[in-house]
Amino acid sequence: MVQGKGLTGFILAIILLQGSLAQSFEENRKLNVYNQEDGSVLLTCHVKNTNITWFKEGKMIDILTAHKNKWNLGSNTKDPRGVYQCKGSKDKSKTLQVYYRMCQNCIELNAATILGFVFAEIISIFFLAVGVYFIAGQDGVRQSRASDKQTLLPNDQLYQPLKDREDDQYSHLQGNQLRMN
């Protein structure tokens, strides 16, 4: 029982130390990204030097004075991507990768996304086929209606005779021959 409490205390101490280590690493960052309300993206360098040099993709962009330690990347709609770094005369920051995905309704097509679409399509076609099979496979037995039982013509009279007409256009069956009564 005593060993179990000691092991639990040891695991708890390790977890707490990892949290404090992560917090101390976060506090030591010298390069931060800020997304402004107007849509612009700012990089802030926290090195204590008079001259700050900005780098993008390893190439120098600009040299600023110490009280101008912010670099405006422009509007986030213009897709400010890249690997940025700031460097003072004595120390330099770690690299920071900035990536904005501006298409809010877009889907990034990778293998997992395409596989998901194909799988969903196959499943939906399967359910549709099962539904059609069960609906079409039912026997045609239906309840008879009153209109099905109603006779429209009496049984003894299959055809209605033509009325006698004198010399009208439709009083003749063939050609110009008159109809005899």
Swiss-Prot record:
Residue ranges annotated as motif Di-leucine motif: 152-153
Sequence ranges on the Extracellular membrane side: 23-113
Location(s) in or outside the cell: Cell membrane
One record GO biological process: adaptive immune response
Molecular function GO labels: transmembrane signaling receptor activity
InterPro entries: CD3_esu/gsu/dsu, Ig-like_dom_sf, Ig-like_fold, Ig_4, Ig_sub2, Phos_immunorcpt_sig_ITAM
UniProt keyword terms in alphabetical order: Adaptive immunity, Cell membrane, Disulfide bond, Glycoprotein, Immunity, Immunoglobulin domain, Membrane, Phosphoprotein, Receptor, Signal, Transmembrane, Transmembrane helix
Boundaries of every ITAM domain copy: 148-176
Endpoints of the signal sequence: 1-22
Residues linked to a glycan: N51
Residues bearing PTM Phosphoserine: S144, S147
Disulfide bond entries: C45-C86
Residue ranges crossing the lipid bilayer per the database entry: 114-134
Gene3D superfamilies on file: Immunoglobulins
Domain of life: Eukaryota
Every Ig-like domain range: 24-97
Keyword tRNA processing listed: no
Post-translational modification: Phosphorylated on Tyr residues after T-cell receptor triggering by LCK in association with CD4/CD8. Phosphorylated also by PKC; leading to the TCR complex down-regulation. Phosphorylated on Tyr residues after T-cell receptor triggering by LCK in association with CD4/CD8.
Cytoplasmic compartment spans: 135-181
PROSITE patterns listed in its UniProt record: ITAM_1 (PS51055)
Protein role: Part of the TCR-CD3 complex present on T-lymphocyte cell surface that plays an essential role in adaptive immune response. When antigen presenting cells (APCs) activate T-cell receptor (TCR), TCR-mediated signals are transmitted across the cell membrane by the CD3 chains CD3D, CD3E, CD3G and CD3Z. All CD3 chains contain immunoreceptor tyrosine-based activation motifs (ITAMs) in their cytoplasmic domain. Upon TCR engagement, these motifs become phosphorylated by Src family protein tyrosine kinases LCK and FYN, resulting in the activation of downstream signaling pathways.
Complex and partners: The TCR-CD3 complex is composed of a CD3D/CD3E and a CD3G/CD3E heterodimers that preferentially associate with TCRalpha and TCRbeta, respectively, to form TCRalpha/CD3E/CD3G and TCRbeta/CD3G/CD3E trimers. In turn, the hexamer interacts with CD3Z homodimer to form the TCR-CD3 complex. Alternatively, TCRalpha and TCRbeta can be replaced by TCRgamma and TCRdelta.
Protein name: T-cell surface glycoprotein CD3 gamma chain
